From Swiss-Prot:
<protein>
    <recommendedName>
        <fullName>Unique short US2 glycoprotein</fullName>
    </recommendedName>
</protein>
<keyword id="KW-1015">Disulfide bond</keyword>
<dbReference type="GO" id="GO:0016020">
    <property type="term" value="C:membrane"/>
</dbReference>
<feature type="domain" description="Ig-like H-type">
    <location>
        <begin position="43"/>
        <end position="137"/>
    </location>
</feature>
<keyword id="KW-0812">Transmembrane</keyword>
<keyword id="KW-0325">Glycoprotein</keyword>
<keyword id="KW-0732">Signal</keyword>
<comment type="subunit">
    <text>Monomer. Interacts with host TRAM1.</text>
</comment>
<feature type="topological domain" description="Lumenal">
    <location>
        <begin position="1"/>
        <end position="161"/>
    </location>
</feature>
<dbReference type="InterPro" id="IPR014756">
    <property type="entry name" value="Ig_E-set"/>
</dbReference>
<comment type="similarity">
    <text>Belongs to the cytomegalovirus US2 family.</text>
</comment>
<feature type="glycosylation site" description="N-linked (GlcNAc...) asparagine; by host">
    <location>
        <position position="68"/>
    </location>
</feature>
<keyword id="KW-1043">Host membrane</keyword>
<dbReference type="Pfam" id="PF05963">
    <property type="entry name" value="Cytomega_US3"/>
</dbReference>
<comment type="function">
    <text>Participates in the inhibition of the host immune response. Early protein that redirects newly synthesized major histocompatibility complex (MHC) class I heavy chains via the SEC61 translocon to the cytosol where they undergo proteasome-dependent destruction. In consequence, infected cells are masked for immune recognition by cytotoxic T lymphocytes. Seems so far to be specific for HLA-A, HLA-B, and HFE loci products. Does not interact with HLA-DR or HLA-DM.</text>
</comment>
<keyword id="KW-1133">Transmembrane helix</keyword>
<feature type="disulfide bond">
    <location>
        <begin position="52"/>
        <end position="133"/>
    </location>
</feature>
Length: 199
């Protein structure tokens, strides 16, 4: 399954706006509050927060940098094993106070199950700073993201994750089928439900 995903990303790389990311820190929670690549000669900025998590296929991230800056570039990328895809954020996801701070709170970004880390390329006062965030995975097996959860488990070879996804998906489908059969077989019950939804 891993080779299939790698081949798919390779094909996507040849077609889409993907870039090669620099090598850097990959351990979760380690060195998240310092850049792994920076052209800044002196550390004139301070990273106050850099966190992210995946919730059923959606990426959420927040962070902040404090320092005397008058201009910035905020360029987040999804890291798919060293290959980065540009992530597009809304203007109101980033808050910039000139001379004081840059804060971001990115929500509901779609990422593929082979997502590894969030790479942030920041240009502050002309200095290029790279941050990396390894996401925490939050799973709700009762959500509608069954395929994403199943693919994530297959890519990570977490077969327990795949099994729980299949179990909850089967329960939901069974309940749906029982409800449809129960309502359509009993005509009186069908009319009652129709009146309920019409009114």
């Amino acid at each position: 399954m891993n080779n299939l995903w790698k081949a798919w990303v390779g094909l996507w790389t040849s077609m889409g706006p993907l870039i090669r990311l620099p090598d850097g820190i990959t351990k979760a929670g380690e060195d998240a509050l310092r850049p792994w690549k920076s052209t800044a000669k002196h550390p004139w900025f301070e990273i106050e927060d850099n966190r992210c998590y995946i919730d059923n296929g959606k990426l959420f991230a927040r962070g902040s940098i404090v320092g005397n800056m008058s201009r910035f570039v905020f360029d987040p990328k999804a890291d798919y094993g060293g290959v980065g895809e540009n992530l597009y954020v809304h203007a109101d996801d980033v808050e910039f106070v000139p001379g004081e701070s840059l804060k971001w709170n990115v929500r509901n970004l779609d990422v593929m199950p082979i997502f590894e880390t969030l790479a942030l390329r920041l240009v502050l006062q002309g200095d290029v700073i790279w941050l990396r965030c390894v996401p925490e995975l939050r799973v709700d097996y009762t959500s509608s993201a069954y395929m994403w959860n199943m693919q994530y488990g297959m890519v990570r070879k977490s077969y327990t994750h795949v099994a729980w996804t299949i179990v909850f998906y089967s329960i939901n489908i069974t309940l749906l089928v029982l409800f449809i059969v129960y309502v359509t077989v009993d005509c009186n019950l069908s009319m009652m439900w129709m009146r309920f939804f019409v009114c």
